[in-house]
Amino acid sequence: MSDFIDLITPSQDAVVARLKAGVSPALGSVHQHVKQDTQPPFVMVGSIDAANEGSKGSQAENITVELHFVTRGPSRAPLMALMHAARACLEGAALEADGVVFETPNYLGATVSNAGADGVTYAGISTFEFIAEPA
């Protein structure tokens, strides 16, 4: 039996790298962690869940990643454009990280909010899943 490795961190890093390479900065910035007072528009990695998909003695994990989006403006159009750009660069794309093999991400769905209390802030969540295993 081989040693088990951390698959969550390289999964997060691979998603962030793919988003940074594929989402135009004009649509929004990409973050693993959003610092306080970061102004929209942006996308950040939210919750990450890992479920065992390996057989006895082997490691494979079904990784589910939420992406959180925040925009500000007179309509939801910029939010939906940012969410679409993220989907376009992740769904079916090759993820890469040293020591890890990924299946291509599958898009599971999304939620888009109404305007926040200020009337101009919009938020959304998109969810993707993929299998990760040691190389």
Outline where the language-model segments fall.
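Residues at secondary-structure transition points
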Residues: D6, P10, G54-S58, G73, ...
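Oligomerization/assembly interface segments of phage tail-like spikes and tubes
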Residues: Q59-G73, Y122-A132
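Short, polar/acidic, helix-capping and beta-turn segments at strand->helix junctions
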Residues: D37-F42, E53-N62, D118-T121, A135
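Small/polar-rich, solvent-exposed N-terminal microdomains that initiate assembly or binding
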Residues: M1-S55, A88, A93-V101
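Acidic-leaning, charged glycine-interspersed low-complexity segments
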Residues: R18, P25-A26, A88-A135
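Mid-chain, well-packed structural core segment of small domains
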Residues: R72-G92
